[in-house]
């Protein structure tokens, strides 16, 4: 390894032999030879050394410091030659004062033998830089941009002082006769108020009991392969695969996709990451179970590089319960300004990592996101400490007292299903179990795969206001939402992957009303097809934990009525679905006339508490005085309109295999579904009626007609099929004379309008009888401009009874018929035909000529979607009627958008005025829409 300019921690040697750590650059030749011989024997060490050489050319890298532990040296011997086999990662830094530090290091190495074998070292709390000289450290602190006075803190008792002499005198007087084999688990915490706006310097490492070389090598290997990028001292991120450097986190996230195939590369998450916390993770991960390490990361919003709050974590070796310091903390609670002690077995290697870095060597970008969903435990024998910062961590909060349960039985580890904290008092006093510890907005939880089945059935705290033990960060939520969106599109049914035997009883399936679209499946697979945690208030049993690795389901206790809000938020799809619904509702509100009749029907037909099928199903909750009174209990969606909330409940419905997500068509197999989806996605083709040429754009078709067929530019191509007059009004039909197909052709008896359906000609016939606007039968939207109706129909693209392609052809055909009438009349009143009912047409060339105005349609002539579906075998439901008007001059284009009342013909250019007017007709509108008696008579005709 190359020589490093930093020096590791040097601690006092009192009583018993201790490990003295130093940089490899100052190791004696005998130590280097011994190290090289040991590296050859251990391939893991050899690999890590090579990796260190690769990344050693940058300004600041993490390096491995190797030392030895031997009996206490004599006062005349050089203590640097008496190092034991102990390996810890440390942060190596270079600065303009590197030469000064090297001089100080040489001076310190020559004076280590003095002062009765005791040595002191000063450490920067921002980057963990170590120096035996206080002057060098002060110069180093200035590199962080800190101009405040340096605050010194003792690593043994955390006593603080502004004077170097006072602190040195304190160390000599207070700790010269005390044993240093164990770190103190209950620091005094004094000077906590002085941490603000000042930089702390501490002496934090104290190595005690020896460990085997195998455990140390495993720790080195784990730390070496954990991160594929490094954070430089001067604010630069560096990729360890290709040496790419950048200064922003978003650039590193973009660069991560270039290494998506690497097993050691996962999507970086910086939600919890600041430099002190990152060094905390790397330092604690390499500490074996019997090593006492106190790592203190101190900083605040003014001084810390990443503006993170102060965090203190202390890990102590295992002690008998009678002598464990945890018992004292259970009596008084642990303050935020004190160190939190975690108890672990000596055989276990402690690992502290962020959630995205679990099992990093075996995960890809997608599988790491799956890990966040499942929260699966790590390998057996390891303790995963998941550290994440809550959104409230940036706020200044009063200290909270937490009780840590120290009664951990041997051979048992906490289950991830129990990673919840229960409320034991009305104040700020909580009880945290063995899985979670809260440190001022910082949650540290750990899990293990070892858990008895009897413990899995233990219920959570019955209080629904219990604080959650695990909250996902914003970065995790965004990744999970992306994964959920992908799952909803690519996986028609998720529940098929689960075994019914692995799922417990999930409440009462009949609690879901059929109106919500919830299918009555034979198993409790209702909402897990989308991985949505769906608590019902009246259910006695519920699913509280779902682990993808072993499909473990833990049942709630019988007295449990409702899951807490924190648990509801852990569902991966709920926030995504809520956003989608709110965007959809906002789009509907901004529409010109969309869904007016539907809103009037919903609001006029039923009172808030009269819908027993909706509110009585325990799925929709009605809050009388709220701005959005209707709230879905399966997620966080709320609305002020019953129609929206009923439409929203579709998202909780379980889809069948091979079901179309747009029109809910159920295919037989994947190929059938693929061919069906083409109908929703294929582009429109414009067919020339004079020849067999087809074009993708209307302009190409018009150019072709003008050049090849010598047709005027203002006219569209007239259809050359033979037509039989007056058969449309009488319901008669005839075969096309020049086509071998059996397609029927209907024709208007007044003009030359033709259609392939009787309904289309019948609706067109109203043009000659009364004044009618172009109207959408799905929502009541009216307009006088056919292209405006075409644009409007995009809003119904996801309707199950709507085919945009066929409706678009019908609109184009209506425009084309208008153009033909204009060409034949030449000064006569122009008849603007309406859009026909859906169905295949012979062609769709169009010329934009529209001059109609808006009036109303008579109540008796309103048709609903079910009637049209019966009359037309295509199953599409959209009819638009039009009316005629005169033009000021032939060929003049005139377009006006009016909002028309469908009852009395009231017209207004303002949507608000129409809404105010239509309140007078609410009863009539509801009766018209709900009246379906006339459909039988129409079918008979």
From Swiss-Prot:
Coiled-coil region: none
PROSITE patterns xrefs: ZINC_FINGER_C2H2_1, ZINC_FINGER_C2H2_2
Main location as per UniProt: nucleus
Highest taxon above the source species: Eukaryota
Keywords per UniProt: DNA-binding, Metal-binding, Nucleus, Phosphoprotein, Repeat, Transcription, Transcription regulation, Zinc, Zinc-finger
Cellular component terms (Gene Ontology): nucleus
Disordered: annotated segments: 165-198, 455-477, 823-856
Biased composition (Basic and acidic residues): 165-177
Biased composition (Low complexity): 178-192
Residue ranges covered by zinc fingers (C2H2-type): 122-144, 152-175, 237-259, 630-652, 658-680, 686-709, 746-768, 774-796, 899-921
Keyword DNA-binding attached: yes
Positions of post-translational Phosphoserine modification: 95, 415
GO terms assigned for molecular function: DNA binding; zinc ion binding
Locations listed in the record: Nucleus
Keyword Nuclease tagged: no
Feature: compositional bias, Polar residues: 839-856
Biological role: May be involved in transcriptional regulation.
Record-stated family: Belongs to the krueppel C2H2-type zinc-finger protein family.
Protein name listed in UniProt: Zinc finger protein 507
Species for this entry: Mus musculus
Annotated gene: Znf507
């Amino acid at each position: 390894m190359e020589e490093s300019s930093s020096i590791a921690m040097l601690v006092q040697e009192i009583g018993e032999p201790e490990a003295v750590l130093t940089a490899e650059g100052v190791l004696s030749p005998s130590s280097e030879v011994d190290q090289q011989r040991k590296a050859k024997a251990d391939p893991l060490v050899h690999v890590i050394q090579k990796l260190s050489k690769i990344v050693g050319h940058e300004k600041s890298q993490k390096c491995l410091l190797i030392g030895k532990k031997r009996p206490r040296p004599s006062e005349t011997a050089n203590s640097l030659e008496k190092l034991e086999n102990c390996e810890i990662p440390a942060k190596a830094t270079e600065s303009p004062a590197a030469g000064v530090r090297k001089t100080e290091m040489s001076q310190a190495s020559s004076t280590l033998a003095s002062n009765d074998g005791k040595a002191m070292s000063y450490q920067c709390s921002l980057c963990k830089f170590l120096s035996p000289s206080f002057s060098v450290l002060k110069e180093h602190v200035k590199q962080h941009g800190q101009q405040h006075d340096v605050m010194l803190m003792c690593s043994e008792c955390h006593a603080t002082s502004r004077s170097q002499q006072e602190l040195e005198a304190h160390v000599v007087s207070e700790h010269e006769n005390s044993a240093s084999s164990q770190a103190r688990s209950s620091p005094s915490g004094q000077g906590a108020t002085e941490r603000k706006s000042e930089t702390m310097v501490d002496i934090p490492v104290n190595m005690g009991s020896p460990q085997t070389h195998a455990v140390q090598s495993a720790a080195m290997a784990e730390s070496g392969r954990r991160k594929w990028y490094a954070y430089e001292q001067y604010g630069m991120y560096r990729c360890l695969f290709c040496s790419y450097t950048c200064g922003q986190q978003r650039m590193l996230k973009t660069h991560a996709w270039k290494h998506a195939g690497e097993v050691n590369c996962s999507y970086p998450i910086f939600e919890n990451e600041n430099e002190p916390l990152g060094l905390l993770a790397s330092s604690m991960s390499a500490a074996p179970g019997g090593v006492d390490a106190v790592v203190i990361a101190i900083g605040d919003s003014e001084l810390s590089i990443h503006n993170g709050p102060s965090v203190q974590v202390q890990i102590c070796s295992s002690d008998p319960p009678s002598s464990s310091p945890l018992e004292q903390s259970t009596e008084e609670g642990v303050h935020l300004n004190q160190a939190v002690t975690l108890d672990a077995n000596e055989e276990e290697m402690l690992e502290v990592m962020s959630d995205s870095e679990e099992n990093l060597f075996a995960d890809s970008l997608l599988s790491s996101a799956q890990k966040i969903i499942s929260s699966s435990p790590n390998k057996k024998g390891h303790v995963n400490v998941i550290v994440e910062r809550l959104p409230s961590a940036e706020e200044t909060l009063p200290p909270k007292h937490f009780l840590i349960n120290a009664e951990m039985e041997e051979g048992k580890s906490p289950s991830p299903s129990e990673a919840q904290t229960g409320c034991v008092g009305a104040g700020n006093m909580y009880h945290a179990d063995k899985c979670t510890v809260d440190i001022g907005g910082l949650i540290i939880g750990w899990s293990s795969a070892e858990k008895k089945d009897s413990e899995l059935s233990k219920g959570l705290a019955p209080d629904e206001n219990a604080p959650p033990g695990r909250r996902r960060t914003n970065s995790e939520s965004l990744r999970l939402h992306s994964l959920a969106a992908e799952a909803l599109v690519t996986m028609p049914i998720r529940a098929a992957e689960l075994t019914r035997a692995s799922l417990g009883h999930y409440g009462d399936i009949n609690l879901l009303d059929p109106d919500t679209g919830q299918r009555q499946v034979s198993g409790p697979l209702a909402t897990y097809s989308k991985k949505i945690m769906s608590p019902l208030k009246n259910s006695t049993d519920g699913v509280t934990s779902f682990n993808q690795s072993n499909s473990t389901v833990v049942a709630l206790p019988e007295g449990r009525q409702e899951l807490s809000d924190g648990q509801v938020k852990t569902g991966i799809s709920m926030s995504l679905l809520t956003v989608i619904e709110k965007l959809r509702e906002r789009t509907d509100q901004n529409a010109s006339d969309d869904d007016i009749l539907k809103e009037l029907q919903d609001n006029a037909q039923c009172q808030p508490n009269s819908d027993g099928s909706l509110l009585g199903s325990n799925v929709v909750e009605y809050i009388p005085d709220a701005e959005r009174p209707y709230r879905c209990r399966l997620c966080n969606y709320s609305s002020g309109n019953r129609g929206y909330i009923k439409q929203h409940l579709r998202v909780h419905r379980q889809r069948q295999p091979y079901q179309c997500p747009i029109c809910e068509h159920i295919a037989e197999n994947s190929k059938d579904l693929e061919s069906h989806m083409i109908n929703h996605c294929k582009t429109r083709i414009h067919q020339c009626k004079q020849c067999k040429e087809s074009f993708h754009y209307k302009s190409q078709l018009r150019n072709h007609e003008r050049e090849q067929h010598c047709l005027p530019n203002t006219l569209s191509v007239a259809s050359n099929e033979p037509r039989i007059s007056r058969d449309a009004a009488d319901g008669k039909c005839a075969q096309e004379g020049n086509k071998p197909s059996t397609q029927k052709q209907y024709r208007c008896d007044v003009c030359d309008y033709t259609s392939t359906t009787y309904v289309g000609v019948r609706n067109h016939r109203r043009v000659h009888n009364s004044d009618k606007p172009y109207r959408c039968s799905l929502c009541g939207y009216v307009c006088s401009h056919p292209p405006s109706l075409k644009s409007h129909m995009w809003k119904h693209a996801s309707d199950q009874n709507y085919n945009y392609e066929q409706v678009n052809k019908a609109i184009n055909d209506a425009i084309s018929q208008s153009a033909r009438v204009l060409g034949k009349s030449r000064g006569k009143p122009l008849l603007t035909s309406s859009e026909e009912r859906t169905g295949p047409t012979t062609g769709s060339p169009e010329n934009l000529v529209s001059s109609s105005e808006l009036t109303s349609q008579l109540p008796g002539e309103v048709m609903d979607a079910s009637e049209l579906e019966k009359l037309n075998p295509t199953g599409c439901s959209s009819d638009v009627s039009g009316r005629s008007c005169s033009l000021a001059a032939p060929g003049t284009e005139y377009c006006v958008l009016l909002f028309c009342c469908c009852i009395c013909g009231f017209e207004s250019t303002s949507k608000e005025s129409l809404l105010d007017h239509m309140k007078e007709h609410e009863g009539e509108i509801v009766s018209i829409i709900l009246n379906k008696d006339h459909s039988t008579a129409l079918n008979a005709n």
